[in-house]
Structure formats: structure tokens, C-alpha cells
Swiss-Prot record:
GO terms for biological process: negative regulation of DNA-templated transcription; peptide transport; positive regulation of DNA-templated transcription. This is HTH-type transcriptional regulator SgrR. It comes from Shigella sonnei (strain Ss046). Residues 26-49 bind DNA. It holds the Pfam family SgrR_N.
Amino acid sequence: MPSARLQQQFIRLWQCCEGKSQDTTLNELAALLSCSRRHMRTLLNTMQDRGWLTWEAEVGRGKRSRLTFLYTGLALQQQRAEDLLEQDRIDQLVQLVGDKATVRQMLVSHLGRSFRQGRHILRVLYYRPLRNLLPGSALRRSETHIARQIFSSLTRINEENGELEADIAHHWQQISPLHWRFFLRPGVHFHHGRELEMDDVIASLKRINTLPLYSHIADIVSPTPWTLDIHLTQPDRWLPLLLGQVPAMILPREWETLSNFASHPIGTGPYAVIRNTTNQLKIQAFDDFFGYRALIDEVNVWVLPEIADEPAGGLMLKGPQGEEKEIESRLEEGCYYLLFDSRTHRGANQQVRDWVSYVLSPTNLVYFAEEQYQQLWFPAYGLLPRWHHARTIKSEKPAGLESLTLTFYQDHSEHRVIAGIMQQILASHQVTLEIKEISYDQWHEGEIESDIWLNSANFTLPLDFSLFAHLCEVPLLQHCIPIDWQADAARWRNGEMNLANWCQQLVASKAMVPLIHHWLIIQGQRSMRGLRMNTLGWFDFKSAWFAPPDP
């Protein structure tokens, strides 16, 4: 019998007997474990061989045998739990232990670095599952980061300095304002073994032609082997950077026929997905990666929803025991912000916008927050920390304003905290705030109407590219803000847009109201080398490494 199954049977027997040694019979024990008398005898003999108990059998009618426990079910359960942790079987661990506090304690104690059979393994604690990793779909901040570890694109953007670098394409050139040529590497392989072909690249780029920032791609052809020509309907100075974004990641052309591709995607990037469940994401270094092989062999993201309620939650590399240190911190390039929905009467009303912006000012929100949040929140006066576009102007409450609806996407504890503070402030002015939580996909599409929306945005480097690109790619914003987005996109592509002025106009009209910049923190011990936090609050797994243990 497999060891795990035998351990489960012993724990069950120990629990049924309440851990007490006793005189009993094979029939009684077999009834407890719902098995045959013969199988019960086999179990007892095997458990005795393992040193867990002794079974002194007595022969004869009416005679009772002696069962003595030498090992407790709790101790064996702990041992089994340790085995499951080492095997990264978090699903089974949760089922075995049951108690969330105990599971958390065990997970935290095993975070950080592990060196097993010559392999470097990094264990990370996160507050929610990362089930959708499909490029081109609605991806949140962390999913965007993970997708970059799994997939490659024609170009890539250096996370530290925002500079454009080669990826699948080793060189490129602009033939004319409407014609770009990219030269691709041969010998690139997908995680499932197949070699990348030009048809994969063409199919991947054509599938995103419906997205606003890629809608100007008129044609994609390969005139010669490993050469890709992209023809545009309008000039775009940002095209090479655009092709390094997550929507433009390269997928196998048969991706739609592959099982559960969104949660178990196949790319050509430095890491391949091994497991992705509600309790764990495991990615493993791809030995056939065309670039430098990752130095960390395996990354396990363990999911523990309970840490979502901790203000500094998010990403945890090392547990609080011992010498815990803050590895990296940075003020996010972005903010929480209010978005007024021009589709509703109250959302479009300028008096409502002015008054709500006044009473829900950044300083008010921070003032009414608990101290643990005040340490991590910084009042925002622009979409970026360096901008001071918003001015707090005293405004009178509009007559007849009695209620407002606020909507945000779920699985984000700080949304609830901020919304609760808003509800408290508005209630003091006799305004009821109705709060709605919807899925991230529903939020992204923006087909639901709400007076105001509570959103957050994290912009990546280079900011003069990503800020407009991010805002333009969220359909919700285009539904709520009635400006000529296509005309603005054309100006942006031509390099004719003053981005700071454009954002200032959105803030001045109260279409968007910056609220809070958040400090991004990675918690842990300084045992890892090469860790550089990016603007998404994560770090490039393939660039980090551990010094090997002392011999």
C-alpha cells in the first residue's frame, strides 16, 4: 500500500479510537474503517512494521486483542503535511489539515529558498489564484507579470530601464512610415516541443487586430524565411514597443485546441507552466529557452487568500520567523482613482463630480484610514507620483443628491477598504453609497453602468508609452469618458501628444480623480541575488538567483 494511503488509514484509526490503547477485535476495527476483516489484519501488520502501533492478537471465541498506539495521529499528520509541502501538493495539504490558521503557519515556514536534488526552488505566497494567463485577454497586474515569464514576443522591454530589446526578433527596421520589417530567430521552441514557425507569429498578431492599439495593422506577411513584414494603415512610432506588450505575445497557432490553455498556457518563454490550480501555480525553467536559461529552476506561487486582508500582503517571499527584512519597496507608477461614468445622470453631472471629488479627496481618504493603511498610502494628485494635476476646490453638495453607486472588481481587499471609507464619509453628508463588486472581466468590458468606478492602474516603463497604451486598452474607460479615443491614438502614434497635458485634462474635467499611490513591497530575507522590483510589484524570475549552499 502506498505510504500516503497507509498514513491516512492510521490517522483515521487513531481518530476513531480517540488515540487510546484498548482491547478490541478485528471485526470492530474493520467496521470502524469500513473494510474487510482480512484487509484490517493486513493494515495492522503493516502499521506495526512501521512502528506506529502494536497489535497483540488473541485467538479464540470471545477473546479480545490488544491495540497499543506508539505514534499519535497528530504527529503522523504533521509528517504527512511536511511531505506534501515538500512535494508542493497544496491542494492535498488543505484537505489533510483543514484548519486555515495551521495551513498558513506551515506555508509561511516553508517560504523562500529551497535547494533540493541540485535544483533551486523559490516559494512565494500570494493572496489569490492566477488562473487566466491568456495574452490579449483582460489580465490583472500579477497575471501580466506571470505571462511575461511564460511567453515571448518579437521584442521585449527591459523592466529596469524601459529600453527596447530584442526577443524573438533579433533586428528590425522601418522601411517606410507604414511598413516595418522584423528578422526572427530560427530554432525557437514552444514548451510542448514544437519549433516556432512563421505561421505561429502571423496568427498571434492577427488575433489581436480587434484591440484598439493594434487595429491599424493592415497586413502581416513573410516575404522570405524568418522575415516578417507588417503593413500599417497609419504611422506608429511605438510599433516596436507595442509588439513587446503582453497582448502581442506569441502563441502556438493551435492554442484554441489545447486543453485549458488560459490556465495552462504554452509559450516560448523562460518558464513553462507545470501546475495551475486554485491553491498553487508552479512554473519550471524551460531548458530549451532560446535566451539565457533561468537560474531559479522552479517557482511555486502558493495561494493563501487570508493574507489579502493584510495591508502589506500581496507578495511574500519569506515568513515572519527569524530575521524578516523588506527586500524591495517602491511607490507605484500609477494610482487608485475614481472614474465617473458619463452614461449615468449622476456620473455625468459636473456638480456631482466636483462635490464628490472634494469630499472624497486623497487627504480625506488617508485621514480616515486605519494606521496600517496610512503607512502604505500616499495622496495622489496625478496619475503618476511626479504629477500634481488635481486641485482640491471646495464645492457645495448638489441639491437632491441622496445616493450613488460605486463599482469595482472583486478579489481586491483594498478596494473594499477604500470603498468602506468612502461609504463612511458620504454617509456623514446624508448620501448613501451602494457598493457593487463584479468580476474583473465584467469590469474590464465596462458594459455595466455605475455612477462612479473605483479603479487602479499600474503603468510599466517606459511611462510615455505605457500610460496611454494602458488607458486606451481598457474598454471601460472608453465607455465612461466620451472623447475621441481614435483621434487621440493617432496623435499618440505620431508622437504629437503631450501626455501630461492629456492626463491633466482628464483630471481637470473630473473624468478621472486620482486618489492614492500605494507603496509596493516585497517581504522577505535578503538571501536572493539579482532581485529588482518592477513597476508591477514583482521581479523577473529568470534574472534572480541564489548562491549555492555551502559544501
